[in-house]
Amino acid sequence: YSAVTADLQIQDVVNATSAEIINGDIQATHLQGRVKLETVNGDINLTNVAGELTVETVNGDISGHHTGTQDARFVTVNGDMQIKSKSALLRLESVNGKIDFSADNVTELDLTTVNGAVTGRVNLAENGDINGTSVGGKLDLTFDKDISARFDMQAHAGGSIVNKLSDKQASKAKYGPNKWLEFTIGSGSARVELSTVHGHIR
């Protein structure tokens, strides 16, 4: 389905759903199967959406709850994102926007932000994997107390690293404005790699 200058409400679809709207919002409720939603100059709101999911906005916000464990990808350009997800494989990407998310039992999490901020609560599966990058932005992640992972963090071009999981603090390069921090919590079964250019990791 595609439309220009129109709002769209989709609900109770159990098969594949694809919608592209220009100058309008999408409200998606109780969807299953493969779901792909796109807007330009519009917002997308999700309520009880399961299945493999791709959501993209330009000049619009994304909000809601993805209840399925299938792969999910959310992308905003000049918009904010507020997402709760149970996806095992979750990708969040933003340019000039904020990401606020929670991920439950995630196996693979990819975070990318340019000139934005990422704030998230993460329940990382055993042997899970997180890759996060920011350019001129912030990565602020909170983990469960029983987290078991190897952490590798790097900050370039004047970026900063704050560690509240252990007593270990970042090392600073002898030459150049670079910092790095490596440590392990628990058995280190999972892996967390975060990097920033002229941004902050916390």
Short names for language-model regions:
Residues 1-202:
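Intrinsically disordered, low-complexity terminal regions
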